[in-house]
């Protein structure tokens, strides 16, 4: 859709959880990077599934089973269209981004990485996009290499080209950093990887909720994301993989539905995408994810981008009026809707606890990015993040709470 704005007040009404008060204050939920809230439209389709056609898929010919199968496979088609994948078989439903990346590391990685090969990542990665590759490198006696970052936590083309070479077999990179808000040029990185015969696996957990994705344009070999960060249910994720790669990969989980034929001593596997979806799949969650995608598409990514950009820049400017507050990452005009910060000498957990008393929900800790924390020279940070239901009032509430927090911790008892 081409709309450049939406009625945020109307959007807020779609999220029942935002109606409540926290500590007798209006709730300012600024933790969507960890988990977004869920609109009533998604809640309704989940309720409808369990009330009207709760059944297993693929196996039954009865009416409820057919309805459930249609809902599940229609959800797959919705995801395919959403990211412009070429084939429906390229969409694998998983438990989330972490599970998706692990499938790639274990199935593709174990079969294609040998001693002396190189796997390229960055220090800005979530643990879900470091640990699987770290373990793969250990299993195969391969080398894990890191693309250097600038002081603002961005990647430069020369450094990317200098790190990826003919020994590189896999490049694993976040489209958007969950800490810094850095937006990586994954299309260019994919092109460089392919020039050296490597594949690229993109962690899209922080991009899928916020920007239009086109797998034909990006040319990623694998792309992973989660439903719960994009207005959908928890427990559902997506692994996109190019069909020719997935066809040659072995399944990593075994059981019902993913088989073609089972004898006493051997088995053969079902075709894509089923061979990667062992057991009863995430039926309700997939249907809920599809509805979340419809909701996002109705708002339009242009409008979502403009809304988040305005909020992020406003928050960036207002937060920097507080003495002793340091923001990490790129400048305000080159970041996604994430602001990670520290306030004077106050521990981030104390900051998060203090602002919570004022109804403000932010995240504190290492954000599953300990190598990045070490790179920043800190043990932890606080983080505010913005989505479609946030307003300048939320930002003002955060800034006021931070000022009160600083004043409280500066008081000499």
Swiss-Prot record:
N6-(pyridoxal phosphate)lysine: modified positions: 229
UniProt entry tagged with the keyword Nucleotide-binding: no
Catalytic residues (positions): 368 (cysteine persulfide intermediate)
GO molecular function, a single term: cysteine desulfurase activity
A GO BP annotation: cysteine metabolic process
Cofactor: pyridoxal 5'-phosphate
The protein's name: Probable cysteine desulfurase
Organism: Staphylococcus epidermidis (strain ATCC 12228 / FDA PCI 1200)
